[in-house]
Amino acid sequence: MFVEAPAAASAGAPSLDELVVLSWNAHLAEGELRDLIGKLKSGELTGRPVNHFVLLVQELYRRGDAVPEFDVHDRSAFAIVPRDPESFDVEDHAASLGLSIFYVPSMRNGPELREDRGNAIVSTEPLIEPFALELPLARQRRVALGAAVRVQTADGPKRLELMDAHLEPLSSPKTLWVFKNPRAGQVRAILDVLDTDRYDGDAVAGVVLGGDFNTVRAGAREDAYRLARKWSTSLAHEDRRDTHMMGRLDYVFAKLEDGWKMKTRRLDERFGSDHYPVLAFFSR
C-alpha cells in the first residue's frame, strides 16, 4: 500500500538538521501512532516543534478484504491479539494522518483473521522510489522496506535513503528455534543492497537504516548489531538503554555525507507498545 501525502503537507525539502527519523515497533494496534506523531509535531519529545520527519515503523497491521481468506494449505504466523476491534489499522492511519505511507505486509496475522502485519514508512515528505526487500527466510517471512526523501544541502537537493527492517527473533524448527541465529544473514542481505549504485554518488546525502533487530540473544554483542554498527560510519552517539523487556532490540544507523553526524535517543514512553521508540537527530 502506497499513499502519498498531499502536496501542502510539506513546504519544500528540509535540510538534514531539520529532519527527524524515528524507529518504533508499534505492536500492531496496541501502539498509539497518532499520539506519538502528535507529541513529535508539538515538540514535546524533542524540545522544539518538528515539521519534517520519517517514521520507520514495524508491526503495523491491515485488516479487511484486501487480505486473502486463509486456505487450509497455507501457513500463517500466530495472531497478535487481543485488542479493540475498532482500533486503527494502516489504512485508517493513511486516511486520517495526511502523511506519506508505504506499507508492505510480511505475514498474515493469524489464520482466523483477515489481517496481515508488516513494516511501514510514514513521513511528512514525499517518498521516492519505495521498494520491498524480502529477507533470507528463517522461521517467518520478513520484508524490509526502502525509500528516499528529498533533503536540501549546500549543493542543492539530494536524496536521503532509508531502510526499515524487522529481523527474525528465532531460527527454524530444524535448529530447535534457538541454536542458529538468522539475524546476521538478514543484515548482510540488507547491507548488500545498500552497497548498490542507488546508494552511491553525489545525488545521495546519506543512508539511514533502522528497525527492530530482535537481538534477543545478546543485544549489541550480536553479529547483526556489529555488522550494522561497522557500516554506520556517521553514528556519533547512541542511546544504549534497553528498548524492550528483553533488552536492547531497536536501533538506528547511518552513513552520511562528510561533515554530518547522527545521534540517537530512546524515548521514555512506549505509546502503548512493548517497545520504546528510538529518535535520530542529524547535525554538522
Regions picked out by a protein language model, each given a short descriptive name:
Residues 32, 112-114, 137-141, 269-276:
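Solvent-exposed loop/turn segments connecting transmembrane beta-strands
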Residues 1-97, 103-113, 188-191, 284:
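N-terminal, active-site-proximal structural segment of metallo-dependent hydrolase catalytic domains
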Residues 98-135:
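Catalytic-core segment of enzymes that process non-peptidic bonds
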Residues 28, 131-136, 167-183:
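Surface-exposed cleft-lining segments at the edges of enzyme active sites
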Residues 146-163, 179-210, 214-215, 219-222:
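His/acidic metal-ligating clusters that form di-metal
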